[in-house]
């Protein structure tokens, strides 16, 4: 079913993105890391909750089958793209036209996304440690009037319509001087409910190597996002929209003889 062909001899619409580009994007979710990097792939994020940033994907617009989502294959097995650790991705290829997706039949009618994870190489053992810390903050928040400006402009609008002002001068003075917050509150709820930024952390430890007989690649990872909600500590349980993820990947290739190979791929994710 699968084979190799020189790129210059291929006439199909195929675009490939190397894993290095995915790794260098400071994001914890592969769904967001490839946004804008693959021509023809449209990504629509439907959720901003940490760890749930996935959404809808379309290849060259909407197609005909089911929910129009491309078929995602990770090492030849159907998987969700957002359960992968970006560091374990070797390459991502998208098959966009009928010539490229013909071997997948009806399942490929919406396009196909092929993800290849990293594997061992015939080399000395290579140990890698990747640690990243970043700050995440809201890009744009609405700006609301304070209580005094709202009351003043509300009175002005009523006067312009030939009506009596709703707020008295005494009330306006209280709003202005903020001397009676119980009866004349002036709260900035966005400032109270949201933090200025959240801390995002990501740590990965990988081991890669092999020889002529066996090749291996192992990865363990941890990622977290502290969340943007400004919560207190009165509860024994967490009330913030946070995320903690533990992931593991193990790819082992063993060549028993020249006609018989064994490949064992294991992956897990807990969130």
PLM regions and their residue ranges:
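Short, small/polar-rich motifs associated with maturation and membrane association
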Residues: 1-250, 254-257, 261-263
